[in-house]
């Protein structure tokens, strides 16, 4: 009976951690969409707020300021495709996601987004580290 209770407890615990790890991909996509919306509004300050480590780094801050304001477009922003930085982070990981978005009927914008994912035991957090200038539509991210 004790073994059965332990097995059930273990299964529930692992299931909870897996659910947290899988939901981080959705959180990453939502934050990437927030960046795209800020860029479409031409709100460079919002892009830097969404990437706080970039905002504190002089080179990253300058690079972001150089392109983020040029992406202003009218219309509702939609994600055409998002490839997450990591499918399921079981430890702290830094990776690069690929975001394709457009506003209204405009042409697609494709960007790479550097992401820090925390392991599920420490909360499974997602932090955007930096966003790249637009890349070619068929280009991959490093």
Language-model segments: which ranges?
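Generic hydrophobic, helix-prone segments enriched in Leu/Val/Ile
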Residues: 21, 60-64, 113, 128-131
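Short solvent-exposed beta->alpha transition segments
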Residues: 45-105
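Short low-complexity stretches enriched in small and charged residues
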Residues: 2-6, 52-56, 139-141
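Context-gated lysine
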Residues: 31, 53-56, 133-136
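Short, low-complexity N-terminal intrinsically disordered segments enriched in polar/charged residues
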Residues: 1-37, 41, 49
